Regions:
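Hydrophobic h-region of N-terminal signal peptides that target proteins for export
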Residues: 42-51
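Intrinsically disordered, low-complexity segments enriched in Ser/Pro/Gly/Ala and basic residues
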Residues: 2, 29-32, 47, 121, ...
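N-terminal secretory signal peptides that target proteins for export/translocation
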Residues: 1-35
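OB-fold and OB-like single-stranded nucleic-acid-recognition modules
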Residues: 52-194
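Sec-dependent signal peptide recognition
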Residues: 35-43
Length: 194
């Protein structure tokens, strides 16, 4: 018996102890629906991998080092020093890297977070949303003084990127691996370095 996609077929099923017929519906297209869902899932996985590859390439073009991984500790506030009347405080967290399995100390400049309070003594609101277990994507400058870490995970205010001053970012990754917005892209205080 031949079927066509979407065609509903019936099969007689004999019940035990009687000659009653029951009809059971079989949909010829149900197997292909599962295959189509698997194809969509595989395409989504490939797209997220491609997106990460594109993000890594963009980070290299911005003269930065690219890291992704899980937050294992933080965020915590660290006071800074005054620069032209604005406190340059930091937020610190620890990231377990996907690339090499090592823990990195992440030093985040609060002044580049949207809504930064120049007189505040706390983690800025966008960075306060980061929780232990969250996945992050970072582009910045590696350092080894005082331990392994990364900083400059922020905009460089439109200057030409260099290895000393990359045009970096900090993004929270969604469960599907897609990156969110850069949490360190505020240009409000770029005037401090002009």
């Amino acid at each position: 018996m031949r079927s066509h996609p979407g065609q509903v077929m019936y099969r007689n099923v004999q019940t035990v102890g009687g000659d009653h017929d029951r009809r059971r519906r079989l949909t010829a297209g149900s197997g292909s629906s599962i295959i189509n869902l698997l194809r969509v899932f595989i395409l989504c996985l490939a797209a997220s991998g491609t997106a990460r590859a594109d993000e890594a390439a963009q980070c290299r073009a911005n003269a930065g080092t690219f890291l992704t991984g899980n937050v294992t500790q933080g965020p915590t506030f660290a006071p800074g020093h005054l620069h032209k009347g604005v406190e340059l405080s930091h937020t610190h967290l620890t990231l377990l890297s996907d690339q090499d399995g090592r823990s990195y100390h992440v030093a985040i400049d609060n002044v580049f977070a949207t809504g930064y309070d120049a007189a505040g003594e706390s983690v800025p609101a966008p960075l306060l949303t980061i929780r232990t277990g969250d996945r992050l994507e970072l582009c910045g400058k590696l350092f080894t003084r005082g331990g392994l870490g990364i900083d400059w995970v922020h905009t460089n205010c439109g200057n030409r990127p260099s290895t000393a001053q990359p045009d970096g970012w900090l993004k929270v990754l969604a469960p599907d691996g897609s990156p969110g917005a850069n949490l360190e892209d505020s240009h409000k205080y770029c005037r401090l370095w002009r």
